[in-house]
């Protein structure tokens, strides 16, 4: 029959569940005092009688309220459902006092209301309330006192499970946590058993000061404030910049209510440990003591310190999950977790404590916690309507993926400019404001010659524009003296100029910054470096950039196509172009200043490729603006690369000498000959300004500065500066071709993630990860495009150089069309003197413009940690357009141009010789028409398939990975009819060895062009059909080589990879296929394993992931020949066999295994046999097997060979079927460890105590150990228990933070003696401190339960066992080996050494070896042979003996 429970039973059940501990009782009473707006709360606890008293000075209660207080569901804090949905107090159910009254034998509540004289009191006995009455003793002030007597008197089991000493510490911890959110309230805690004041926290101003009161000044000084708001959640509080050895200093509050063990704790703890350097263990001597308690663990961990409060609406969460209200559930976990993640990340970046998460950490976090980190980028509020979507996305990329690793950099002063006059100073300040501090730098020049830096709009009267794109650019104009500096806006035009000279420039810019080099007349060359911050650069540049389409500014252009250019970086350098007259004019103005300014940066979505367009053939009246470079983003074209007809060469001394004059921060060129300019014949009647660009960069890990003096037609340095050449006449200057040093943009191999790509190329300046790179220097991962004129007849310099020389042969005719430049790479080890003579005869013009670029291949030197980069930036960006080929030419030219004496270039000289042979054959046919010559050019940066309209011969701009050439469009043509198959095969195979596995290149054949087809204006001889065919072939080849399409999602701010075959998408870059020879042999068979229980499974031990990196690259020639066949147009599709198509197909579901993973013919059969044996016959050692071991002998003075029986039945005989090797050092170490453990305990145990006691040694004088107040209290409470572990404490009254250790375990003293005997420092104090901290942690976490042997003691004993054990190379006799194995068999854990490493290893089961079968004798045949011997053999023997007896002996004469 169902009946209703009585009210008393209901109260008992409810109260027993609601009040589970004494600490919770204290917390409920303290929260009531805080709700009463008390300014002082005092707590007194007696753990012997379970008495609690809480006194406050709050509002107090009158007689009516005292009469109702303590009744269930009576409260003054909540009166309606609206109050319940939006509570303003901690309590709202009216049950706390009623539950406490039910759990205690007596409860007394006395209260006095403010401005009254009477004090009222109410008593509860055994849960029943007595009538309230006036108290005999009047309170001194208003407030309430609640006294609880004999708590849990009816629940003895609950009392017993609570350790009084540990429960008191929990009470203290609860009050401390409560006080952190209420610093304006004073708290105190008194222990009535000892009469000591345990906690006394006066009022303070803020949380940080309260933290200082609790944990000391040292901890509080490390606190850093955090404040963050996202949607309905707001974070506030403090995070420490140092870590702690446990989680006791982690406090998380929700609306000032402490919560425990939530997802938020896991997330914050993970972010502080993995995404910051806070919890990274430091190896310095100062932090060793802090981490000493965890040194015995394999991976010592530190934990963050934080006090964080989350403010939100009460409807967002439910805290009533359990009575203590420390568990919480949120309505929208994702929003809160994202708020926490972004807030902590922002804090770490501000404090320079941020490190990038690794993929392994993120995966491990998701698997362990059931929820993953958020990848979505925090959207910022748009302050201006003019900002477009792609700019927002780029802002997000910059904000989300910046790295703020702590880096050590050389100290340098900021470059300051003196104020020449007040007018220009005010103008510069106004300019700074107009540009929103976009890093405008003003340099004051002290020399007599001063360049006027101007950037006017392009007005090219003689050029025809075939395609034009523009970008708004804000420039700074440094006007004449007396004029104000104006903030102008000019437009940059990119155009393909079809002028008579056919000159166009190409520039490939990088988001990295290079040093600026300025040269003044009569002055030394100074190298200025800019040191800027990433935050200001990213914010200011993106804030003020806009793309506007204003084709009206280009009135002289015949055809203008205006469109915004996405994801491009536009940089521009201000340079001067002046005639000799202007220089003389300006030389008198000594107060003139040069203004150099950074350009603004655009981040959109196609490429970082930019062009520089030269203003050609201007009239004398326009001399000032005659030579300007303009930049626009977009892909380059072959026409712009090879369209230069005139040239200019620069002679420079040895780069080594030049580099030696450069310091790390600033370098000087002492002689003017270093920048001497030679002008070759050409259009000498056109006044054109020339300038030389200098660049310093850091080479490898040597950090050496190297200067390269470059001429100027195709500037290809990132963040370049133009330096005016004032030391030469400018009346007769010509355009010239310039060596290009191109920064190869590629992913670093350290992180290997797409986030790294966006981080590196999505912002202006980035603190690089690699050691050899700095944000203020050009990285050394560069490729060259060089078209200089090198004097080939200078035999001495050519032959004595250590690098491959690059020679340009260019034909100068009277008409305006120019020949394409060709290049020779000459090797020191493979000189072709005949070819050089041939070249000298054919190129007379080379003798007139000498130039030797020594050590030029230093630009191509690649840092070791970047050599694994497999994809260039251009190939990634080309995939975004959908019509480009992915190339993997990273490091091809870099490796090729290295010094021959380096280890990594042993094969390069061979390549050089092959290339030289091919080029000599090419030059022999220089003036012939190119017939069906496939001209491979590695050009992963430009892929527009457009060609020079002024050249007479045709070059191919397609890409191939089989040619070892630079990344930039360096024409390396060869004639198929001239190059033998052997040479090309050597070239192909050598390049294959250099770059590993290659994609299939797309090949194209272009129509040959007759020499007479070129005229002065140039002819575009590529028809629309050929363009369409080229595009289609490129797409087909791209499909063959990669089934993945890249797409940049603006909303997510991430790159998405979409599989063209299946439509599946992923954020992770897919890996390339591994090509291996497809052969079948013994290694391809599967192994069937039958277990003892009858189950069967199949395994293929050869197909392990561990051996994939060591796959043999067999039959690579077949793959290369197949790729060579694709270079022809007709065989592009037809040569695709079913097998080749299948090898390129990437299964989207299952990973494909190679056909042959290990080549057993190369000496790996033995290891495979062991692996198969271990799979087929797994063995598990037992202690019973050790007794059956039979010692054979010692092996190599390191191991003991034994036979062990694996049979389950015991026959008592030694020996067996399994051959094992026993490590003699590990075995003896285990024997010594167990013996030392036995000897460490006292032999006779005390009467009545079931625990063993460690032997101790008395220290004279006692050891002084500094502890915290909490640790001292715990040690005082548990000092009797710690005596069993050999520790004896004395607590002096003079200091609260000091204990004296009178006795320590005996092994500690023995360890100290060994250390001192070896001349080392004392270790006893550090070991004792670690031992004490370990035991205190164990007391708090396990409730006082002790383990068998403390880990610290075991570690000391293991060290002693190791030092005294038998070492390797100690010879042992058979008897000594037998005694060692016998002692090992008596150990408790014979299979491991003292440190946990295995002591024995099975080799083989002799039962599985092939036994030698003895053939049974054929008795019938033996019988017949015996009979035959008796009949014939015996008679013959008798006859021989008779003849010997009848013959006389031979006597000597």
From Swiss-Prot:
CDD domains hit by this protein: HATPase_MutL-MLH-PMS-like (cd16926), MutL_Trans_MLH3 (cd03486)
Main location: nucleus
PROSITE patterns: DNA_MISMATCH_REPAIR_1 (PS00058)
Pfam entry (one): MutL_C
Listed GO MF terms: ATP binding; ATP hydrolysis activity; ATP-dependent DNA damage sensor activity; centromeric DNA binding; chromatin binding; mismatched DNA binding; satellite DNA binding
Compositionally biased region (Polar residues): 935-944
Listed GO CC annotations: chiasma; male germ cell nucleus; mismatch repair complex; nucleoplasm; nucleus; synaptonemal complex
Amino acid composition bias (Low complexity), ranges on this chain: 945-960
Location of region: Disordered: 624-650, 933-960
Tissue specificity: Ubiquitous.
Keyword DNA damage set for record: yes
GO biological process: female meiosis I; male meiotic nuclear division; mismatch repair; protein localization; reciprocal meiotic recombination; synaptonemal complex assembly
Family the entry assigns: Belongs to the DNA mismatch repair MutL/HexB family.
Subunit structure: Heterodimer of MLH1 and MLH3. Interacts with MTMR15/FAN1.
Annotated function: Probably involved in the repair of mismatches in DNA.
Disease in which the protein is involved: Hereditary non-polyposis colorectal cancer 7: An autosomal dominant disease associated with marked increase in cancer susceptibility. It is characterized by a familial predisposition to early-onset colorectal carcinoma (CRC) and extra-colonic tumors of the gastrointestinal, urological and female reproductive tracts. HNPCC is reported to be the most common form of inherited colorectal cancer in the Western world. Clinically, HNPCC is often divided into two subgroups.
PANTHER family for the chain: DNA MISMATCH REPAIR PROTEIN MLH, PMS, MUTL, DNA MISMATCH REPAIR PROTEIN MLH3
Name of the protein: DNA mismatch repair protein Mlh3
Upper lineage: Eukaryota, Metazoa, Chordata, Craniata, Vertebrata
Name of the gene this protein is made from: MLH3
């Amino acid at each position: 029959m169902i009946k209703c429970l009585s009210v008393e039973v209901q109260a008992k059940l409810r109260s027993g569940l609601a009040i589970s501990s004494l600490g919770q009782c204290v917390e409920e009473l303290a929260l009531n005092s805080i709700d009463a707006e008390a300014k002082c709360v005092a707590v007194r606890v007696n753990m012997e009688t379970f008495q609690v008293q809480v006194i406050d000075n709050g509002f107090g209660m009158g007689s009516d309220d005292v009469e109702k207080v303590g009744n269930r569901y009576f409260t003054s804090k909540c009166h309606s459902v609206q109050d319940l949905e939006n509570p303003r107090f901690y309590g709202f159910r009216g049950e706390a006092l009623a539950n406490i009254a039910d759990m205690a034998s007596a409860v007394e509540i006395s209260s006095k209301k403010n401005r009254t004289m009477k004090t009222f009191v109410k008593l509860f006995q055994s849960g029943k309330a007595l009538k309230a009455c006036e108290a005999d003793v009047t309170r001194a002030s208003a407030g309430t006192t609640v006294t609880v007597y004999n708590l849990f008197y009816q629940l003895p089991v609950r009392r017993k499970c609570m350790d009084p000493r540990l429960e008191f510490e929990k009470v203290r911890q609860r009050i401390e946590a409560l006080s952190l959110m209420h610093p304006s309230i004073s708290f105190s805690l008194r222990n009535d058993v000892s009469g000591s004041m345990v906690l006394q926290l006066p009022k303070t101003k803020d949380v940080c000061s309260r933290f200082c009161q609790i944990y000391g000044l040292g901890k509080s000084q490390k606190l850093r404030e955090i404040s963050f708001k996202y949607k309905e959640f707001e974070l506030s509080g403090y995070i420490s910049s140092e870590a702690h050895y446990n989680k006791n200093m982690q406090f998380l509050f929700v609306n000032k209510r402490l919560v425990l063990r939530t997802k938020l704790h896991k997330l914050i703890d993970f972010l502080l440990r993995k995404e910051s350097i806070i919890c990274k263990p430091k190896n310095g001597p100062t932090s060793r003591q802090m981490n000493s308690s965890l040194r015995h663990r394999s991976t010592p961990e530190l934990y963050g310190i934080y006090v964080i409060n989350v403010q939100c609406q009460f409807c967002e969460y439910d805290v009533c999950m359990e009575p203590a209200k420390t568990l919480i559930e949120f309505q929208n976990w994702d929003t809160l977790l994202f708020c926490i993640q972004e807030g902590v990340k922002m804090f770490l970046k501000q404090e320079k404590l941020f490190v990038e998460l690794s993929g392994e950490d993120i995966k491990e976090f998701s698997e362990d916690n059931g929820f993953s980190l958020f990848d979505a980028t925090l959207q910022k509020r748009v302050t201006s309507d003019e900002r477009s979507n792609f700019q927002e996305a780029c802002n997000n990329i910059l904000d989300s993926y910046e790295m703020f690793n702590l880096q050590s950099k050389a100290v340098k002063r900021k470059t300051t400019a003196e104020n020449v006059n007040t007018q220009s100073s005010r103008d510069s300040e106004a300019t700074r404001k107009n540009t929103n501090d976009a890093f405008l730098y003003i340099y004051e020049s002290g020399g007599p010659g001063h360049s006027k830096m101007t950037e006017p709009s392009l007005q090219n009267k003689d050029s025809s524009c075939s395609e034009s794109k523009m970008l708004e650019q804000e420039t700074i104009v440094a006007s004449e003296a007396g004029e104000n500096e104006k903030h102008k806006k000019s437009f940059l035009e990119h155009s393909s100029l079809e002028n008579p000279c056919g000159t166009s420039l190409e520039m490939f810019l990088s988001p990295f910054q290079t040093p600026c080099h300025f040269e003044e007349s009569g002055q030394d060359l100074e190298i200025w470096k800019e040191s800027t911050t990433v935050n200001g650069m990213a914010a200011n540049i993106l804030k003020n950039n806009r793309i506007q389409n204003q084709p009206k500014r280009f009135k002289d252009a015949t055809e203008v196509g205006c469109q915004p250019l996405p994801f491009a970086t536009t940089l521009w350098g201000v340079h001067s172009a002046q005639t000799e007259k202007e220089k003389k004019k300006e030389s008198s103005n000594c107060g003139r200043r040069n203004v150099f300014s950074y350009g603004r940066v655009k981040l959109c979505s196609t490429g970082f490729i930019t062009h520089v367009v030269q203003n050609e053939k201007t009239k004398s009246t326009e001399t000032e603006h005659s030579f300007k470079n303009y930049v626009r983003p977009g892909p380059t074209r072959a026409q712009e690369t090879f369209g230069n007809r005139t040239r200019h060469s620069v002679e420079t001394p040895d780069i080594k000498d030049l580099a030696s004059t450069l310091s790390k921060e600033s370098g000087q060129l002492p002689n003017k000959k270093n920048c001497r300019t030679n002008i070759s014949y050409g259009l000498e009647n056109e006044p054109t300004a020339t300038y030389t660009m200098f660049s310093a960069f850091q080479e490898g890990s040597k950090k050496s500065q190297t200067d390269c003096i470059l001429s100027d037609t195709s500037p290809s340095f990132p963040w370049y500066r133009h330096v005016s050449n004032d030391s030469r006449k400018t009346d007769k200057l010509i355009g010239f071709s310039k060596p290009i040093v191109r920064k190869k943009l590629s992913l670093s191999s350290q992180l290997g993630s797409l986030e790294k790509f966006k981080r590196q190329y999505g912002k202006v300046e980035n603190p690089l990860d690699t050691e050899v790179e700095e944000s203020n220097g050009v990285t050394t991962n560069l490729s060259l495009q060089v078209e200089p004129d090198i004097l080939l007849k200078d035999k001495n310099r050519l032959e004595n150089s250590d690098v491959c020389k690059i020679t340009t042969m260019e034909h100068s005719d009277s008409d305006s069309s120019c020949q394409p430049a060709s290049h020779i790479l000459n090797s020191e080890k493979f000189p072709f003197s005949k070819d050089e003579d041939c070249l000298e005869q054919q190129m007379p013009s080379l003798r007139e413009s000498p130039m030797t670029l020594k050590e030029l291949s230093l630009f191509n030197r690649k840092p070791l940690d970047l050599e694994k980069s497999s994809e260039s930036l251009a190939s990634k960006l080309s995939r975004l357009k959908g019509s480009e080929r992915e190339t993997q030419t990273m490091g091809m030219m870099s490796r090729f141009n290295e010094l021959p004496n380096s280890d990594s270039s042993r094969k390069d000289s061979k390549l050089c010789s092959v290339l030289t042979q091919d080029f000599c054959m090419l030059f022999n046919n220089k003036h012939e028409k190119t017939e069906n010559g496939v001209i491979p050019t590695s050009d992963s940066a430009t892929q527009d398939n457009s060609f020079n309209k002024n050249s007479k011969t045709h070059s191919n701009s397609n890409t191939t990975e089989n040619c070892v050439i630079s990344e930039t469009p360096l024409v390396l043509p060869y004639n198929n009819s001239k190059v033998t198959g052997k040479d090309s095969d050597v070239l192909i195979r050598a390049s294959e060895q250099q770059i590993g596995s290659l994609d299939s290149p797309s090949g194209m054949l272009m129509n040959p062009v007759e020499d007479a087809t070129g005229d002065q204006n140039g002819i575009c001889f590529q028809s629309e059909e050929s363009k369409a065919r080229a595009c289609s072939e490129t797409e087909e080849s791209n499909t063959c080589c990669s089934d993945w399409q890249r797409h940049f999602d603006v909303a997510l701010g991430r790159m998405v990879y979409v599989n063209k075959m299946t439509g599946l998408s992923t954020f992770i870059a897919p890996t390339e296929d591994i090509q291996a020879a497809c052969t079948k042999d013994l290694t391809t068979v599967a192994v069937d394993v039958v277990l003892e229980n009858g189950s069967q499974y199949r395994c293929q031990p050869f197909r392990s992931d561990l051996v994939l990196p060591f796959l043999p690259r067999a039959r690579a020639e077949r793959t290369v020949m197949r790729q060579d066949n694709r270079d022809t147009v007709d065989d592009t599709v037809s040569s695709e066999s079913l097998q080749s198509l299948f090898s390129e197909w990437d299964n989207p579901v299952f990973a494909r295994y190679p056909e042959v993973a290990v080549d057993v013919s190369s000496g790996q059969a033995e290891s495979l046999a062991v692996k198969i044996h271990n799979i087929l016959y797994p063995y598990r050692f037992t202690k019973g097997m050790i007794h059956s071991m039979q010692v054979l002998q010692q092996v190599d003075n390191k191991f003991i060979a034994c036979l062990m029986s694996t049979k389950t039945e015991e026959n008592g005989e030694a020996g067996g079927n399994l051959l094992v090797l026993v490590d003699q050092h590990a075995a003896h170490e285990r024997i010594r460890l167990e013996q030392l453990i036995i000897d460490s305990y006292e032999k006779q145990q005390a009467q009545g105590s079931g625990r063993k006691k460690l032997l101790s040694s008395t220290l004279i004088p006692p050891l002084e150990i500094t502890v915290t107040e909490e640790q001292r209290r715990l040690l005082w409470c548990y000092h009797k228990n710690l005596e069993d572990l050999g520790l004896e404490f004395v607590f002096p009254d003079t200091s609260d933070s000091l204990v004296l250790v009178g006795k320590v375990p005996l092994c500690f003293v023995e360890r100290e003696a060994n250390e001192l005997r070896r001349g080392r420092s004392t270790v006893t104090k550090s070991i004792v401190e670690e031992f004490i901290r370990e035991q205190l942690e164990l007391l708090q976490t396990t409730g006082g339960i002790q383990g068998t042997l403390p880990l610290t003691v075991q570690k000391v004993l293991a060290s002693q066992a190791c030092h005294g054990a038998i070492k390797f190379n100690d010879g042992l006799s058979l008897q000594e080996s037998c005694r060692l194995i016998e002692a090992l068999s008596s150990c408790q854990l014979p299979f491991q050494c003292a440190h946990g490493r295995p002591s024995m290893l099975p080799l083989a089961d002799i039962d599985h070896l092939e036994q030698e079968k003895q053939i049974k004798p054929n008795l019938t045949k033996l019988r017949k042979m015996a009979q035959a011997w008796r009949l014939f053999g015996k008679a013959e023997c008798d006859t021989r003996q008779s003849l010997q007896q009848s013959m006389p002996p031979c006597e000597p004469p």
